Amino acid sequence: MEEDKDSDTLQILNDIINNEPNLEIYVKSKNNNYISSRELPTQDSSTKTSNITTPNNNNNNNNNNNNNNNNNNNNNNNNNNNNNNNNNNNNNNNNNNNNNNNNNNNNTPTSLNSSWKSVVPKRKIDTSSGAILNNNNNVGSPNNQSTSQTNHQQPPPQQLQQQQSLSSTSTPSISPPMLSPSRRNVTSPNLTRSDPTVPITNSRPTSPLTPPLSPQFQLNNLNFDDNNDHSTTTTNNNNNNNNNNSNNNNNNNRPKLMRENSINKRSSLQTLPVSSSSSSSAEDEILIKVWLPMEYTGQLYKVRKFSGGSSTLKVSSMLNSQLSPMYQSPKNKLFLNNEEKPIPSHLTLKDLSLSKYDILYLRREPEYELIIPSSPQCGSLVMDKDIKIDDMLIKIEHWLKDILDHAPHSTSQQQQQQLQQQPILHVDKHEYFTSLEDQQLMSGHITNSSQYTLLKKLSVPTSNSRQTGKMSRGYYLRLYDQKPISNYGIKIKDTLIFKKKILNRGLSIDDAEGGIEITVLYSPLSMLPTTSDLDFEKELKENQQQLNNNNNNNNNNNNNNNNNNNNNNNNITTTTTTTTSSLINQTNEILLPNLIKIDNTSLLQDIKNEKKKRKSKRTPSSVGLPFNIIHKTHVDFEYKWSGTSVEDTFEFKEKLGQGGYGAVFKVLHRETNFPLAIKVLSITPTRIKDIEKEIDLLKKCRCPNVLSYYGSISSKLTELWILMDHCAVGSINDMMKICCDTLDEEQIAVVTLNVLNGLGYLHSKGIVHLDVKAANILLTEDKQIKIADFGVSQQLQTEYGQANVYIGSPLYMAPEVILKAPYNSKADIWSLGITLIELAEGRPPNRGLRSMNQLVEIPNMPPPKLSNPKDWSPCFNNFLATCLVKDPVQRPSVIDLLSHDFIKNAKTTEVLSNLVKQTLSSRQSI
């Protein structure tokens, strides 16, 4: 039987030699003598040889070829079974049986010696396509295939008959021989190239052991790729008896395993089949979180799909083109997680190694850009991110000089001389002040006030009754001249009103009549989304749902892997499986960051415990509760309002006033008709921590003399609404201004008693207010006195606190706070003494100080006192002197002051009835 195999092999070699005149093969005999193929006698089917051996693979340095040779030898029987005809259907169904495989492969040459060599001068044979690669005529290419066929000689009829006899007598397990293109078209018309589009390369093996003109070939079983259709019956059998491994691999989008060629490896320049390339391109897509502030619709980001090989320049150009024409700009660049520097344009998305927590920001460098929709001919105005309002007003005047009725505002010569003579003090650190006058005092000079003002339209709903003329009056926030624009949370699509100043009492609604409407085209604050409106319960649900999805996906993947392992025990080698799985794992880490398996069960248990803790958490007793308002499901344990829209929940009535960072409005709760006060604050990077601290302190306070906190609402990206008690009268300072009168001694005593009660409660909680003054003492319609404004309050973790910057109002600061020395709750006692002088005389002492240099001298000055002490009782004078002790150690506490005779003799709040009625009537008439 072995002699028959050798004769068939020799016959195949003779057929190749007869069709290739330039091909000469040397055969090594048993005597170690090389015999040329031209000297060999013609062999027929009865010729028997047993001296031909297979080549030695040890000289091949290509590791991939060695692995593939081993795979082919191990799976030799299975590969041959896939090419059987209809006559061997039973054998194909039992392709895992080694006995049947050996019986079906009787004609396979297995007794060839390992020293067979061939010499091919300047040629290379590719059996998958039947093309001679190094031919000058590009044999095997689609364009020159017909030309190559004519250049080859047709085989004689005798050889054709021999081939037909061989094909009819041999078993189907014998693989077709390597044929030239001309012979292949005659004998095997069904044999076609596995991939005609594969380019043909002229490269040669680069192994140092391979001579340039005599490349070594390995002679394995002459098998073609599975893509070659040998006959119709073979194709049907292959489809019916296809291995389950290939089906599972296709379902997992893994690259199809390709068998190695019989003589040489497929060229590295050849492409994969179309199905494999399409699957790889699908895996190459990446889902990315993109922040587009110009398209903000309530979500912090959008998910877009891009190719992993796309450069950041291409992605930014694509996103920029999808914006509306007004927001398209060549300045837009990509920033990873809102970093300061943009992403280099040459990097690809795969190079960034994005995770599910990363967000790409499409923005430009920090700056402000303004446009006028009604006057597009004016173009746009670009300003620095740290510009102040007064400088901004001057720029806008010059920008709009063509459409203004008069020339830009210019200062007089006397005012310019005064400005030059007045020194400007440089403040190294950021100082927090609560009023415009305090800011001017600390800046070291009185700046020139412009005749124009700038208003910011707030996102507060207005009713139809407020429509006056062409423009809605709405609700606007005045921007103070000495404040930087970054303090007001100006963002993209905000509306500003540029108009002349109108003198008023500061209590009426600012309207936009006669002003020019300006739209913010770009703002750096739009790049800073906050998570204040994110619900913890919602986040836990999303995390739990994601973990459940991941577990389901992992279970499905494990089931598929088990099926694959059961079906692929005899079909896939260990090397190929390891390589494919490693590639897929690396791809999943980069392209599918959301599908991450979490094996840490303790983490899941912590999340569940935290969720149960949140649900079972009761309202702390230290939180100010709205006792006379009905709360429904739209208020959570953190007092965050959600559910219905703000417009449907509250009805805005009027603007009560404003400060340096926000405004206060009176609203009605529609369901209960209960009045509330909403403080609208602009969220900025420098104010986020202060606002969060203020809310945290409000939630911890439950006292009749402390302003109650009803919750917070995140209406938009850079605005936060704080719900508080509505004090219809307003502050003591507003009441004195409206009534044009100060308080008498009885009224001061009752106010002091209630303030001490509130301060005593705060100090018991470790909270230092640090900004006690008449403007922060509020009165309700029922004559209840409450302490408000915790914007600069501090909760001391130790006995003493340290102030590194000036905190509070400068004229009310305690000496230790001015000197930036350690302080404690007794700093509020000093501020209370200054407030009592303000209530008695209408203004605080040391009002004539004009600079910080003079203010620093307060600790060295004698304690302040009343201007006319004789007009007041000795008890009141003694109480003031007790509060205004410069040494904090000698200064009394709240408990000590409550035992003073001035407080013991205090009456009820009915002594304030006349002032309260006068104030309410004046407010209603406005």
From Swiss-Prot:
Gene for this chain: pakE
Catalysed reaction equations from the record: L-seryl-[protein] + ATP = O-phospho-L-seryl-[protein] + ADP + H(+); L-threonyl-[protein] + ATP = O-phospho-L-threonyl-[protein] + ADP + H(+)
GO terms, molecular function: ATP binding; metal ion binding; protein serine kinase activity; protein serine/threonine kinase activity
Full protein name: Serine/threonine-protein kinase pakE
Start-end of Polar residues biased regions: 36-55, 108-117, 183-204
Active site per the UniProt annotation: 771
Cofactor(s) annotated in UniProt: Mg(2+)
UniProt family annotation: Belongs to the protein kinase superfamily. STE Ser/Thr protein kinase family. STE20 subfamily.
Gene3D superfamilies: Transferase(Phosphotransferase) domain 1
GO cellular component entries: cytoplasm
Entry binding sites for ATP: 656-664, 679
Broad enzyme group: transferase
Entries under SUPFAM superfamilies matching the protein: Protein kinase-like (PK-like) (SSF56112)
Region Disordered, annotated ranges: 36-257, 546-576
Protein source organism: Dictyostelium discoideum
One GO-annotated biological process of the protein: intracellular signal transduction
